[in-house]
Amino acid sequence: MGVITRDGLDWLKDKLIKAGHVDTFKLEGVKEDRKPVIGGGLSILYALFDLLGIEEMHTAQGALRQGVLQDLLGRLENHDNTDLRGTMVTALASRFAVDLAQADRVKRTALWLFQNLQANLNKKASRLIQLENKLSWAAQLLEIGTRISHSDFHKHGAYILDNADLTGFSMPELHRLSQLILGHRGKLKKLEPELRDHEFVCQLISLRLAAILCHARREPDLQGFSFQQSTQSTEFAIQCTKSWSQLWPQSVHLLQEECDAWLKSNWQLSFQISSGV
């Protein structure tokens, strides 16, 4: 990879001055149709070096796509209409024939659960919106791996996202989504590094519980069901009424298994059935 320095800029400026005109300027590797823009590009680089105090610049493997600054500004101001990521997620879900009704159920349930944890996260509203968006996208793409195989589909889905090229997403963002999908079921040991991040844990536990509550692929019954994080930030608590547990015995069984899964991590999940109706 090449490196641009001030000495290099001075050398190029001298070559341009000696040439007198772009038509007579010669430089190995420069195509004829690029010559007219060299002077302007050199001026911009000089200004950047001076204004930003840059000592050297390294060339990158890619380039900024058209409109990326407007896209990033829209994200900061939470303007959904300028953020391409949601559009890309929808397109990817369609490409892998995701059950959109189920994805929507899981998404809405995960967001409802996550909103119960936001007080303990103690984050600004703009940051909470960002976390909700990423949780929504993970829920929408939860089942993309089923197109490959229903066995270990969460692993296939994580692999797809880790290797996808989705406009608007950075590689770290895609990896975070892949880890949410990978961890939405099964053992938590595979996510030990990520479980040090409180934000990630709140997203993950919301997604795992949403998948459980929507396991029958129908609208979950959230009446008589509550979820919160205790004042001790490593403990989460589920509570349901006795009548809820009687109506949904399979969900109760799955939730109890979920509590056992979290026992093997640094985070704890409890499940209590109240004596009330």
Protein language model annotation of sequence segments:
Residues 1-217, 223-238, 242-246:
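Helical "lid/coupling" subdomains associated with nucleotide-phosphate turnover
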Residues 225-276:
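Charged substrate- and nucleic-acid-binding regions of tRNA-handling and nucleotidyl-transfer enzymes
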